[in-house]
Design a protein with these regions (language model features):
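Cytosolic catalytic domains that perform sulfur/thiol-centered chemistry
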Residues: 1, 89-119
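P-loop (Walker A) phosphate-binding loop of NTP-binding proteins
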Residues: 39
Length: 119
């Protein structure tokens, strides 16, 4: 089994690491036979998979990932996911001098993630 550490948080330093490692993260998911674990119970798996979908897999026609930790029925919401997605988008925009996708597309994808937390 191959080990790959993909950090998840919304602070600028971690977002920079996430963006840098993102192509490798996507490649590992695309190859299949992967396992994602968040040992702290902070539901970072949801955040990682939503980032993968919003910024990469949705463009390939992949269905969005199911939300397991941030479910409304369990008293949670998607605020943490949204904060990371927003920080990721902002960092990429600043780094590249252009938006990674049109803001309307980004908002629509975030809306899909929010809806998934209600299912």
């Amino acid at each position: 089994m191959d080990y790959f550490h993909y950090p998840i948080d919304r602070d600028r330093e971690t977002i920079a690491k996430m963006v840098k490692l993102f192509p490798t993260f996507c490649e590992k998911i695309d190859k299949g036979d992967f396992y994602i674990a968040c040992a702290m119970g902070l539901h970072r798996t949801d955040i990682a998979l939503c980032t993968y979908w919003v910024f990469y897999a949705a463009d390939k026609g992949t269905v969005p990932p199911p939300i397991r930790g941030y479910r409304q029925e369990n008293g949670h919401n998607t605020n943490k996911i949204m904060r990371v997605l927003n920080a990721f988008y902002q960092y990429m925009t600043e780094r590249d001098g252009k938006e990674p996708m049109p803001i309307e597309v980004f908002k629509e994808r975030k809306k899909v993630v929010n809806e998934l937390s209600k299912l």
